[in-house]
């Protein structure tokens, strides 16, 4: 029988880890818990859709990566209608170069086509980007706020993304939060979208996803 310390080492080696403490929002207070995913099984939970790249559940974590043959970033999503909300998720770079965590407008909310915003993270920086309107050739994406930061490969980090009204705040434990706003951010969203960049075999691991209403 494994000792508790040996069991913890095995869990960490396989990919899972102890849940991080809840990060507290600054735009409001947490309301109802809308979603909790611990990825304890060996199959993708209901509500997730893999579109491009690799996506699997193993060792207590969600593994995601880009595939060269797809010719685009690894893309997957979790359906969850929401508006004002707080999203907390743990992530760990395992070779991959970057991740985007995005929200889109629900159908009928805006005339704009494309994403509302993304929190983009690489091992050297992170930002909040407002995306272009794909229906407008003159529209361009722009980083509303960015910061140079180091995120080590093989280390778990906990990210909190808050959205309330026209404001978005992104917090990573131990880092100064990023804050941005836009007149379009207040709309209803159909779920959470993720992108991963990197070479074949390079991954990002995700774990302990929780989403709350933000009041």
Mark where each language-model region is:
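Secretory/extracellular carbohydrate-interaction modules
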Residues: 68-134
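Flexible glycan-contacting loops in extracellular carbohydrate-active proteins
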Residues: 180-207
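Short, aromatic/His-centered strand-loop micro-motif at the edge of beta-sheets
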Residues: 135-158
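Beta-strand-rich interaction surfaces with strong enrichment in secreted/lumenal proteins
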Residues: 24-25, 73-80, 145-151, 195-196
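Short carbohydrate-recognition loop motifs
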Residues: 53-72
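Carbohydrate-binding surfaces in secreted/extracellular proteins
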Residues: 39, 89, 153, 158-181
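Bacterial N-terminal signal peptides
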Residues: 5-15
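Extracellular carbohydrate-recognition regions
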Residues: 21-50
């Amino acid at each position: 029988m494994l000792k508790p310390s040996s069991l913890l080492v095995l869990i960490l080696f396989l990919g899972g880890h102890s849940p991080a403490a809840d990060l507290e929002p600054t735009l409001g207070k947490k309301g109802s818990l809308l979603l909790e995913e611990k990825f304890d099984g060996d199959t993708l939970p209901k509500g997730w859709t893999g579109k491009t790249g690799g996506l699997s559940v193993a060792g207590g974590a969600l593994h995601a990566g880009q595939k060269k043959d797809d010719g685009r970033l690894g893309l997957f999503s979790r359906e969850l209608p929401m508006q004002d909300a707080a999203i907390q998720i743990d992530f760990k770079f395992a070779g991959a170069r970057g991740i985007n965590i995005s929200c889109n407008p629900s159908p009928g909310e805006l005339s704009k086509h494309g994403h509302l915003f993304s929190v983009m993270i690489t091992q050297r920086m992170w930002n909040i980007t407002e995306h272009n309107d794909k229906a407008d050739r003159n529209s361009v994406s722009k980083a509303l706020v960015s910061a140079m930061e180091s995120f080590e490969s093989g280390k778990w980090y906990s990210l909190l993304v808050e959205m309330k009204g026209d404001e978005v705040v992104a917090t990573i434990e131990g880092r100064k939060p990023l804050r941005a706003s836009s007149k379009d951010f207040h709309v209803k969203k159909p779920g959470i979208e993720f992108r991963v960049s990197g070479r074949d075999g390079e991954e990002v691991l995700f774990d302990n996803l929780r989403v709350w209403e933000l009041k």
